[in-house]
Amino acid sequence: MRIAPHIVAFLALAATATADFATEMIDATFKLFDPAVTGTSFLVRREAPDTALYLVTAEHMLKGTKADTATLVLRERLDDGTYKRRDHTIPIRRDGKRLWARHEKDDVAVLRLADPLPVPVGTIPFAALADEAALKASRIGLTSQLFVLTYPKAFEANEAGFPVARQGIIASHPLLPLGKKHSYLADFTAFGGDSGGPVFVPGAEGRPMIIGMVFAQFRHDEQIKSEYEERSIHYPLGLGDVLHAQYIRETIELAAKPDAPKPPEKAAP
């Protein structure tokens, strides 16, 4: 069967757009961990004149850490096109007090990173976080396809520390309007380590549109009791709980306020 040249060109263009939106998102997504807990995070930038970067993750992940610092797994692109893992320590507390901004109601935290990172990193513009108007315009809803980037059970895609890409669908209805229900269900198997991972779809001009953040999984717990044994069995339901991006936006704005918690200043060399 012969395929018309214009169809071939269209398919090539579509493939390029898909690669672009996913690559832009993965370049801004990083593992965040300490000896006690591992999660996923991503970097957002606000419009000028704000030059800081905003690290987004689930608050329960940061609350589970034990020290005043955590490790952000960065990646350095080498001249031959390969990547090298670069673990970078960031402050998350000062004298035991949190440095992150948190939402009043939701499990999301944002750290404002004012100091430059040791290697160039990808970031996602604040405008890519979908508010209610953007969701309405996109016409996504029940069974719409979505993508996630996470570190399930701390697993990395390769030695450079890239996250794992997966796909699912929106599994609950209605998605809108935003109101008392700040989250929705997604049909993909969630694991520990996924929390803080971006949930996204293709946006305008081949750019990613973030429609939420993974923060929980669902499972069925069963208690087994007999005369000589008592144990619990956890059955995964193959569902993740996703916080709407609107509430990530609100938390970033909290982190950007002058009175928000600030990390300690670096000592002069």
Stretches with model-predicted labels:
Residues 1-7:
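Bacterial N-terminal signal peptides that target proteins for export
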Residues 12-52, 266-269:
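Protease-domain processing segments flanking chymotrypsin-fold serine proteases, especially trypsin-like
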Residues 26-38, 47, 63-179, 187-188, ...:
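Serine endopeptidase catalytic core focused on the charge-relay Asp
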Residues 40-42, 169, 198:
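Residues located in well-ordered beta-strands
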Residues 57:
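Cytochrome P450 catalytic-core helices
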Residues 60:
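Histidine-centered active-site/metal-ligand motif
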Residues 185-214:
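Catalytic nucleophile loop of clan PA
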Residues 209-269:
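C-terminal cap/linker of serine protease catalytic domains
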